[in-house]
Amino acid sequence: YIPVDSPRSFDECMYILMCGTGVGFSVERENVDKLPIVNEHFEDSTTIITVADSRPGWAKALREMVAMLYVGQIPKWDVSQVRPAGARLKVMGGRASGADPLVNLFKFTIEKFKGATGRKLFPIECHDIMCKVGEVVVVGGVRRSALISLSNLNDDQMAHAKAGEWWNANGQRALANNSVAYKGKPAMETYM
């Protein structure tokens, strides 16, 4: 279980999923409110994140990406050490997905942060990044991640995260089962 209350929550989720364990996470307001404010301006950085071809290497790269985004820097990345798509995986079995899913996660995360300039990430944005992390944990085209997302009962964005044709614009949301957390028994009208 990971409360999304720290920038490290995203890379911790990635590492745990890559080790083959499912992750429950909370984007309840009481957790997300502990995140720092996203910088008001972004600029391209000359910093290059070098991604090592390992579970800790991928998680570390995401940690570095998120840390830089919080200070308004958009780094470049070097994925040349990552095994190509289709290469055999000896320890976990199956075939490598290559660097494309990780690069897509980086680009997705950059866009989410750019949409949150000067404020904290919303619970739905944190949820979407966590789901996109789950999307990366695919080996040889086979989903290897399981997620459950907990949110507040009165969070309308999370309540409607899978309403309508959500899969067209937010396909990453398919990676998590969504539920609510509450301290006391809610009134029946809440669900009507």
Regions found by a protein language model. Name each.
Residues 1-192:
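Extended catalytic cores of very large enzyme megasubunits
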